[in-house]
């Protein structure tokens, strides 16, 4: 897992209690209160997608914590929800349109016999952080 690898690389402890499998808004509503009640409450959340991050954001606000002063929140996808949340959500833009266009081009090439179907194709699509109001 990238998160754990980054911690280990920087000689930081991996606290499994802070890692939750949560990929949707409803699960974020269920799991975030548990994390916020820990003795050493997290001061930041990174979510697998923007919908999950919005769930975290809503729980944090409902608990009376100030975003981003007390808790920072970052999503991943940079979809339209990030631009209408309150506060506006910081998110990693994964360039989904470009990803889809490349995938479709590769599929069409394979279907047309231009590409060997047994060959694995690896493409790197760079992401970028879109900083808004939910992080400091």
At which residue positions do the language-model features occur?
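Bacterial carbohydrate/catabolite-sensing allosteric modules
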Residues: 1-136
